[in-house]
């Protein structure tokens, strides 16, 4: 088994909610194009591509409601070849899903994280993967987020994204630009 056969690309929650819904991704620009490039490169090199789709567990939810247009995968992601589609209802892609079993059955040792949002499902999934013994590669420009304001304060998308990347690199992942990741396949 080659090193590439021991890797998989996880494409997390590239759904219309982040483009035409209530949560438009604003940082970094070009993240969708980088995800698509990563998907194409992974397929060309024979790496498994795993699509992950979030569904709100509340049937009356205003975001990620199953069956809604915003819940659907982005059409450019949906049109690309992938090996499996994993459905989840919590930020961690391993929680309550068959993801770990699917990866282990294929001898995957390292996962690359791409998708949305950096600080939620991507960060949580990367941490879970590390806890489960997988190596983790976090695509710095193939993940994205938006500015957030709530009762605890406000943070820009850029600040939030950078803080997660620094934290990921400190302990959980190898943070890498998509173009460098592709060149190393």
Where are these regions (language model features)?
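Short acidic, Gly/Ser-rich segments with clustered Asp/Glu that frequently serve as metal-coordination loops
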Residues: 17-20
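A short alpha/beta connector and helix-capping loop motif
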Residues: 24-51
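Active-site-adjacent betaalpha module
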Residues: 1-8, 36-40, 45, 62-185
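Short, glycine-rich nucleotide/cofactor-binding loops
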Residues: 22-29, 114-119
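Short beta-strand segments at enzyme active-site cores
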Residues: 11, 47-54, 139
């Amino acid at each position: 088994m080659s090193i590439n056969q021991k890797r998989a690309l996880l494409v997390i929650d590239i759904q219309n909610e982040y483009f035409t819904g209530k949560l438009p991704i604003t940082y970094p620009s070009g993240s969708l194009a980088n995800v698509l490039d990563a998907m194409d490169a992974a397929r060309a090199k024979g790496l498994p591509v795993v699509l992950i789709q979030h569904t709100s567990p509340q049937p009356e939810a205003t975001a990620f409601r199953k069956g809604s247009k915003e819940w659907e995968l982005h059409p450019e992601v949906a049109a690309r070849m992938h090996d499996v589609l994993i459905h989840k209802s919590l930020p961690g892609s391993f929680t309550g899903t068959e993801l770990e079993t699917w990866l282990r059955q294929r001898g995957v040792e390292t996962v690359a994280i791409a998708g949305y949002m950096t600080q939620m499902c991507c960060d949580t999934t990367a941490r879970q993967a590390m806890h489960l013994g997988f190596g983790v590669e976090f695509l710095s420009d193939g993940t994205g987020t938006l500015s957030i304001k709530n009762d605890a304060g406000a943070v820009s998308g850029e600040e939030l994204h950078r803080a997660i990347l620094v934290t990921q690199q400190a302990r959980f992942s190898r943070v890498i630009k998509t173009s460098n990741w592709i060149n190393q396949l």
